[in-house]
């Protein structure tokens, strides 16, 4: 009986160690990929998903901006509206480049800085709003929020999707647009609130277009 109790006690201890080891400095329990919380830097997170981020990693290094993502730079917490590898590869094809490093360093730095906010910004922090084309290259912003990026300014807003024919009964969608490019079209976030220890990633849709920024 004593041996059995000892075994049970050890099992409980192991479970407790696992639970506490999964907790991060933000006080949440890391559930891994399923809930978008990762107890690692943003830079380390990118390396766990080569399909979506391998070209992004190369672009960041080529632009000399790695320190923004690994926590060693000026900002310890950022929000990155992440352009994925597929968007980058399409840009290569459209512009006759063979490799990410063929893109001018200045261009890489410019587009990345326009997609980085120097603070942690969650989906829940962005108010409801809209941005509508009101003729030609003119867009009108409704509610939402203006947000300074490392370069330029963004307009952010959320709205509720319809669900099974019921208006505004679905999930919350995050959108953004550049306030620096006349006639820039709206961009949609495909996956929100990917949390890391150095900030938050909101992954842009695969059809993201460089020209809008």
Where are these regions (language model features)?
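Sec-dependent bacterial lipoprotein signal peptides
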Residues: 1-23
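Mature, structured domains of secreted/extracytosolic soluble proteins
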Residues: 23-213
